[in-house]
Amino acid sequence: MESPIKFEEVDIATILKTLPHRYPFLLIDRVINIRADHSGIGVKNVTINEPAFQGHFPERPVYPGVLMIEGMAQTAGVIGITSVEGTEKPRAVYFLTIDKCKFRKPVMPGDIVEYHMRSIGRRKTMWWFHGDAKVNGATVAEADVGAMLTD
């Protein structure tokens, strides 16, 4: 029987080797609880130093929802790439779809966002994930995202 835990944690060094994204568009700090069922949790520490806060909004900073969706997609990409075994390991992830997206609560500087992602489908190199972004256990956003893993 396969163990439910495949990797316990992917740190920032591994994320940098896995994803092509860099500052200011690398939007996850680590991925924890990656499991054999292709689920895991991306972690983003939101600080006032985020470039988006310069214009969103200077008097009342709110972390942009679209950046949370990108954080979900990056988390899904790490989960997908780290789950592929052998020499066929993909080297790139392309974000393809966003469905059923909802923003529920604002995210502010000082919040720690957890992107709870789980695979809901796969066909060849295409993967689909459902994601719930949470702060202190409360859902702040949710979406289904699709991606293609490729060379």
Curated annotation (Swiss-Prot):
CDD domains: FabZ. Gene3D superfamilies: Hotdog Thioesterase. GO terms for molecular function: (3R)-hydroxyacyl-[acyl-carrier-protein] dehydratase activity. The active site is at H56. It is found in: Cytoplasm. Involved in unsaturated fatty acids biosynthesis. Catalyzes the dehydration of short chain beta-hydroxyacyl-ACPs and long chain saturated and unsaturated beta-hydroxyacyl-ACPs. Belongs to the thioester dehydratase family. FabZ subfamily. This is 3-hydroxyacyl-[acyl-carrier-protein] dehydratase FabZ. It comes from Nitrobacter hamburgensis (strain DSM 10229 / NCIMB 13809 / X14).
